[in-house]
Amino acid sequence: MATDEYRALAACDAVIICVPTPLANHREPDLGYLVEAATQLSRVLHEGRLVVLESTTYPGTTRERLLPILEESGLAAGREFNLAYSPERIDPGRTDHTIRTTPKIVGGVTEECCRRAAELYRLICDEVVEVSSPEVAELTKLLENIFRSVNIALVNELAQLCDRMGIDVWEVVDAAATKPFGFMRFEPGPGMGGHCLPVDPFYLAFKAREHDFYTEFIELAGKLNQAQPKFCVEKIERTLNQDRKPVRGSRVLLLGVAYKAGVGDMRESPAVKIIRDLRDLGAEIAYHDPHVPELSEFSLSSADLEAELGGADLVAIVTAHPEVDYERVVREAALVLDFRGVTRGIRAENLVRL
C-alpha cells in the first residue's frame, strides 16, 4: 500500500519512507519532508514495526535524524522497533533493470534490524545485499550517483573544449568507446536533471564539512554540470548569429523538455534554465514534448511539431525522446542544434551538434 495518510499506517507492520530530499536555496540539504514524515509516523508507531528509509540522503541521516524522531514514540530503535536504510535503485523509463532484478542494498541500525529489512525486500527482489550499517548504505547510494555526475561533468567539459577546437565530441566518444577495457561510455548533453544526480554531490559535501573535509573535486563536478545549460544558451546564441540572426526576436523551438528521454519528469531539468535564459535574452520560445503537455511556470503548452518546425528560426534538441523523427526535423527545420547527439550520421548544412 502506498499512502501519505499516516492514520492508514497504524495497522502496517512495515513502513518504507520515500519522500523528496531536495536542496534548500543555498544548496544545502532540505530534510523538511523527511522530518515531517518521521514526526507523523512516530505518533502511530507500534512495537515490532519495521521502518525503512529509501530517500537519497547524506550518511548519518537514518541514525542521527530519523531515529531520534521515531523514538519520541517512547519505543527504542533496535529493541522495540526495527530501523534500516535501503537506497532506491531505479532508472525511470528503463525496463531492462527492474526492482526485482536490481540488487537491493540494506543496512540496519542493528543486525536484527538489517535482517528484518532484508527479509522484507527478499519478497520482491531477487538479490539483497546486507551491509554493516545505515551509513554504509547511505554512502553507497551517493557513490553510485556521484560516479555518474563526475563522469558526465568530464564529458561536458570535453564538449566545451571540442566546441572551441572544432572537433566533433560525439565522434571522440564513439571512438573511445571501441576500447574493450578501461573506458566506460558517458555522453555530454545540456546538463543533468532528475531528483538525484544534480543534488547528491551537494549532500555529500554538506556532510563532509562537518568533518572539516572539503570534497572539492566532487563539488567542482556538480558546478560544471550546473553551468552546462548556460553554455547551451551561449551555443544557441552563436549558432543564430552565424546564421545572421540575433537571439532577440528569434523563435526557438525546444525539442524535449523532460530531464531524460522517455519520461515526463521535469525535476531539475536543464530545459527550464535554457528557457528562462533565452527569454531573458528576448527569444520567443516554443517547445514540443510528448511527455510534458504543459509548462505552467512559463505559461507554455507542448506545440504541434509539424506546425512549429517551419516557423522556428532554430530547433534545439534538448531531450531526445524516441517518438521524434529526427531525420524529418533536420529536413524540415531552418536550423537545428543537437545537444544529444541523436543526429550522428546525418549530414546537412543546417545541422549543428554540441
What spans do the regions from the language model cover?
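Structural/interface elements that position substrates and couple domains in central-metabolism enzymes
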Residues: M1-L354
